[in-house]
């Protein structure tokens, strides 16, 4: 009887395993081939850190040009409780093949048919958050929104999340594509209340002489200064209405007794102003004391937007060196492409299109330096100009001879060895064994700009 029970348990377990295996097979996922290992740690793309107060909405204008909108109650602890104490949010953006290379991000994967493919990227970022040193989770009811800066408005790209536990890419559908301008971002900044003004030529006062209780008495010591600098209103009106627009501006409406000339203005928007210098000075001091924090916050955000656009212009120029497409030139300084999505989990988010390796040439590579000495290279990659992708190779190298290609890797002592566009043009072989005579930089390069200058600005 015991043997029978054991047999039933075994059969039941095998059945469960079989069902689970079929279920997993029915939902294939692309498998990443490499771990996140930066090849040159000192040149890795560093994440920027922001301190978030989870009890209020926060908008971050990142230096890349991306915009991160964090709603209140966006973070959960490991028990699923809403976090209310400060959260450290880290964000970094990857825009071109060198960014991707230096971060060590896997771009090769295998699809459900066993085919080796490579991601072409329209933008990628990593976002993480922690509270008191512990990783936090996304609140599915209050998701963070990222307007990720991109250099392509092509709809062929899909969204993928990298699962750090299984090292697999999960496809999550499409993002929303839109454009943004510097002017639009600045206009979305909150307005500080307008400071007190000194009364000018067309400033006026208002009084209520028709009612025993003066309904305009709160304005008896101030003058209204028309914003447009033009004369407004007239005497002996039936009524005067003052509406506080809540931003330091007031709308004053003059109600006439009868017909008035068409040239007379009955409504105007005004600032509050003072003719008495002592009153003006006092009002200005009170204003600065009351709104100093708000004004500083707005100016800091304005500065962040200005810096982000300046940095965006730099990244556009770098991207153009990789892509060399005419439409990219039109982005500089005028508009930027944004791809909007919600964050479902923290980690790496990729806006990509899977495609095959370059075709036209397939060679078995070995490497030597300019003196013919054999090189044992690691982290060997190829970039095809015009495609925002990174092709990682060991010995077999695929490339399109009709394209402009750059190949590079690292020597055993971490020096940059590279094969230029001109070197590829001189290469006649399309198959078989090929010895690549690499240019080796004399010193170890440790910064992004140094590597960029050698590979793409020389």
Regions found by a protein language model. Give the residues of each.
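Positively charged n-region of N-terminal signal peptides that target proteins for export
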Residues: 1-6, 20-21
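Pro/Ser/Thr/Gly-rich intrinsically disordered low-complexity regions
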Residues: 20-23, 227, 341
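Proteolytic processing hotspots in large secreted/extracellular or virion-associated proteins
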Residues: 23-68, 72-78, 83, 92-158, ...
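Proteolytic-maturation and junctional protease-sensitive modules
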Residues: 46, 70-71, 112-114, 129-194, ...
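Long intrinsically disordered, low-complexity regions that are acidic and Ser/Thr-rich
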Residues: 182-322
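Extracellular beta-sheet/turn segments enriched in Thr/Pro/Gly and aliphatic residues
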Residues: 329-357, 417-458
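A short, amphipathic beta-strand motif
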Residues: 359-372, 379
């Amino acid at each position: 009887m015991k043997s029978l029970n054991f047999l039933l348990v075994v059969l039941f377990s095998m059945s469960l395993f079989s069902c689970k295996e079929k279920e997993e097979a029915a939902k294939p996922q692309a498998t990443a081939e490499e771990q996140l290992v930066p090849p040159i740690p000192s040149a890795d793309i560093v994440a920027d850190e922001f301190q978030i107060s989870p009890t209020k909405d926060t908008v971050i204008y990142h230096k890349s040009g991306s915009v991160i909108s964090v709603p209140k109650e966006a973070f959960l602890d490991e028990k699923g409780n809403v976090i209310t104490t400060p959260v450290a949010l880290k964000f970094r953006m990857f825009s071109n093949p060198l960014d991707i290379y230096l971060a060590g991000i896997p771009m090769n994967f295998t699809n459900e048919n066993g085919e080796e493919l490579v991601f072409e990227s329209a933008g990628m970022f990593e976002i993480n958050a922690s509270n008191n040193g512990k990783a936090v989770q996304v609140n599915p009811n209050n998701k963070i929104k990222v307007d990720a800066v991109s250099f392509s408005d092509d709809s062929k790209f899909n969204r993928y999340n990298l699962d750090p536990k299984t090292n697999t890419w999960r496809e999550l559908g499409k993002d929303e594509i839109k454009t943004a301008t510097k002017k639009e971002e600045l206009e979305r900044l909150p307005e500080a209340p307008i400071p007190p003004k000194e009364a000018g030529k067309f400033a006026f006062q208002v009084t209520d002489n028709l009612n025993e209780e003066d309904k305009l008495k709160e304005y008896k010591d101030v003058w209204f200064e028309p914003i447009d600098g033009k004369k407004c209103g007239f005497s002996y009106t039936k009524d005067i209405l003052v509406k506080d627009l809540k931003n330091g501006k007031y709308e004053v409406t003059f109600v006439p007794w009868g017909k008035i000339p068409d040239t007379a203005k009955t409504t105007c928007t005004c600032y509050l102003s003072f003719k008495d210098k002592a009153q003006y000075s006092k009002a200005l001091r009170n204003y600065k004391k009351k709104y100093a924090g708000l004004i500083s916050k707005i100016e800091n955000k304005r500065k962040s937007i200005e810096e982000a656009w300046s940095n965006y212009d730099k990244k556009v120029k770098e991207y153009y060196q990789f892509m060399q497409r005419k439409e990219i030139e039109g982005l500089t300084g005028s508009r930027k492409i944004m791809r909007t999505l919600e964050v479902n989990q923290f980690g790496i988010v990729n806006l990509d299109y899977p495609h095959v390796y370059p075709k036209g040439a397939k060679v078995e590579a070995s490497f030597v330096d300019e003196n013919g000495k054999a090189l044992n290279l690691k982290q060997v990659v190829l970039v095809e100009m015009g495609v925002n992708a990174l092709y990682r190779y060991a010995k077999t190298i695929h490339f399109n001879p009709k394209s402009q290609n750059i190949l590079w890797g690292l020597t055993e002592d971490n020096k940059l060895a590279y094969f230029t566009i001109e070197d590829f043009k001189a290469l006649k072989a399309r198959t078989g064994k090929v010895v690549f005579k690499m240019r080796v930089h004399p010193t170890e390069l440790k910064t992004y700009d140094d590597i960029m200058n050698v590979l793409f600005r020389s």
